[in-house]
């Protein structure tokens, strides 16, 4: 029943069917022609579906049952930290004093909300080892861009206009070079060594007087801790550059290590990942940016300050890069992150990292006999396998991911990072039980055996979903973006 094909809402439509009722008009009727110019008025009615309320409920309930989320099943998407979002976060975010306020209210009327944001900033400062934090950026890549614009403003304020290049590792998130480009920089790639870490000799080769910054994730996207980070920071700083921390993998070091202590000058965080704001489906997110003291003058305005008279926004910042978002960040996600931090406490956050790392290493060791392990060493919160041996038997990593759908699992991240052939990146997070991990591992082992004994089963997967495999080429080149009403049948 769950996977039964579902008609489009347009196909359910019957002319004249009504799904609502409105009270009799009790004000003077106004004609559209009296309000809008003729150019803005439809000549023909829009072809909208005509359905009953029951039709609507059944249609969208059926579609929702096809969705997969953290609340419905294991979601081991590497580098995405798809952890469970505690429902206490939702309860607090729905407090009337948070849910019913408006960003244009006078500061005096929202002191409680401002206190929460200020306290959240203080917690993030302590967690990251930065000197201050802005909550304004809306999401991770937005935080990246904001941080890079701060670095650019810093160099330009010091008359250093030739620093036009940002260095990123070959294992970097795709958003890193993209954010650098949008911020006006040229990206330079630094290679990884045979251990999956940044090659120090190659870093020394590419760093020069044109280097604005080095962007790093630590641990990196392979799930490996950059153990030479202090030396890397020294190399970049001695050349006059800044060190940027992509906080995508902060879940691996909470309350155990701080970017600020590693030598990073700028850090962005993903509150919707590490600190359990719900994410996926396009947002919302929250990407606060923390900086060291020499970058504070350039933070986007306003900044939230505390005085003896309460909390207020300071707009008097002549060197600021300007606003990066209307108002002051995605407040609802910030409430959820604050609730999470306060409910967990320092010991709880430390346990988050301990269990995230334990889960990842447990899975890696159980799966290593059945898939190639490019870097056979202790990992942090996530790890990378390779489907090279399966590819030799005619089965691609994509096929393995499709086969997992038959067992009700969301596939891991595949083909990323780009420097691992047939890459399978798995991040279990700390919130999953051993029983859940074992269930997924058993299916991965089953798939590996199917590749050897009956590869067609994997090559033709999925078998149990409504949609099997999309024609991705046609979807990209000739997408169907609107419903076309069938022509009347000629009798």
Curated annotation (Swiss-Prot):
Group of enzyme by EC: oxidoreductase
GO MF annotation: an example: pyridoxal phosphate binding
Catalytic activity: N(6)-[(R)-lipoyl]-L-lysyl-[glycine-cleavage complex H protein] + glycine + H(+) = N(6)-[(R)-S(8)-aminomethyldihydrolipoyl]-L-lysyl-[glycine-cleavage complex H protein] + CO2
Keywords, in A-Z order: Oxidoreductase, Pyridoxal phosphate
EC number: 1.4.4.2
Modified residues (N6-(pyridoxal phosphate)lysine): 273
Residue ranges of coiled coil: none
UniProt keyword Oxidoreductase present: yes
Cofactor: pyridoxal 5'-phosphate
Family per record: Belongs to the GcvP family. C-terminal subunit subfamily.
NCBIfam families in the cross-refs: PRK04366.1 (NF003346)
Annotated function: The glycine cleavage system catalyzes the degradation of glycine. The P protein binds the alpha-amino group of glycine through its pyridoxal phosphate cofactor; CO(2) is released and the remaining methylamine moiety is then transferred to the lipoamide cofactor of the H protein.
Name by which UniProt lists this protein: Probable glycine dehydrogenase (decarboxylating) subunit 2
Organism name: Bacillus thuringiensis (strain Al Hakam)
